[in-house]
Amino acid sequence: MSAVISLPDPQPRAARDPRVAEREQHKLAKRLRRQVGEAIADFGMIEAGDKVMVCLSGGKDSYTLLDVLLQLQKKAPVPFELVAVNLDQKQPDFPEHVLPEYLAGLGVPYHIIEQDTYSVVSRVIPEGKTMCSLCSRLRRGALYNYAETHGFTKIALGHHRDDMVATFFMNLFHHAKLSGMPPKLRSDDGKHVVIRPLAYVRESDIVDYAQARQFPIIPCNLCGSQENLQRRQVGLMLKQWEKDHPGRIEQIARAMGEVRPSQLADTTLFDFMALGRRDDAPLPDAHAWLAGSPADADADPETPTV
């Protein structure tokens, strides 16, 4: 079986007039450029003189990211450099020729990092268990190290709007916190700025765009590992919501940018203590507000007198 796949059309359609299809593709490309441009502007993702490392996995998302950034680079208000970087993790049957041939054809500066993380993951993770988490950490470390040693000022990843929404619910359901996958962040060690220019782009548009552009897609499961079950369940939930209530994912994505700390309950984000407190009032003593004194706590509650 070939290690390069073609993306199916998500919704099979009857044969269309080629001119209509061309117009739709043009509109889609224009929409993606606008959304990526808006994300870059809204979050200050790219500045004059930036050297941007575009992480290219061979999947539809990273191909789309690189393609749109190359288009924007030609007319961007500031000059910046793009370099495509792929990490060859030595997975079984990985088609090593695909990305170099594709990138050379584009005339894009690129580099292939060769690091056998697959053997490490295979040795550490028991057979049948999901490898994705450890694999992701090792991949991130390799990419961060390369970015540091080669002077990259930004690291661009291909996560899109739907990824960000799914991560929000993963953290909500499994970690009891309201957090997600930000469009821009500084790495934990403080050395790198990571950007996600596809933050406003929906996955279905990426599927259509990758199909139209005929990217040489490399599947992400060559290692044989299965998708994280929890993430898969969240993905199915969101797809069902979108099917039952079209536009729901977009509403959730917008809500993530409309946070009202005073309408939540995090005392580190909003000073509830000062809200409505008199100037002469002492700060409340939390211990004094516990359920009675120690003696009272062990006693039976009084029976109200009728």
Swiss-Prot record:
Q: Does the keyword Magnesium apply?
A: yes
Cofactor(s) the protein requires to work: Mg(2+); [4Fe-4S] cluster
Report the source organism.
Answer: Stenotrophomonas maltophilia (strain K279a)
Any one cellular-component term (Gene Ontology): cytoplasm
Q: Where is the composition biased (Acidic residues)?
A: 297-306
Location comes to: Cytoplasm
- Spell out the note in the miscellaneous section: The thiolation reaction likely consists of two steps: a first activation step by ATP to form an adenylated intermediate of the target base of tRNA, and a second nucleophilic substitution step of the sulfur (S) atom supplied by the hydrosulfide attached to the Fe-S cluster.
Query: Compositional bias of type Basic and acidic residues: which residue ranges?
Result: 14-25
Pfam hit, one: ATP_bind_3
UniProt-annotated stretches for the region Disordered: 1-25, 286-306
Task: Report what the protein is called.
Answer: tRNA-cytidine(32) 2-sulfurtransferase
Which chemical reaction does it catalyze? cytidine(32) in tRNA + S-sulfanyl-L-cysteinyl-[cysteine desulfurase] + AH2 + ATP = 2-thiocytidine(32) in tRNA + L-cysteinyl-[cysteine desulfurase] + A + AMP + diphosphate + H(+)
GO molecular function terms attached to this record: 4 iron, 4 sulfur cluster binding; ATP binding; magnesium ion binding; sulfurtransferase activity; tRNA binding
What positions carry the motif PP-loop motif?
Answer: 57-62
Query: What quaternary structure, including any partners, is listed in this protein's UniProt entry?
Result: Homodimer.
Q: Which CDD domains match?
A: TtcA-like
Per its UniProt entry, what is the enzyme's top EC class, as one word? transferase
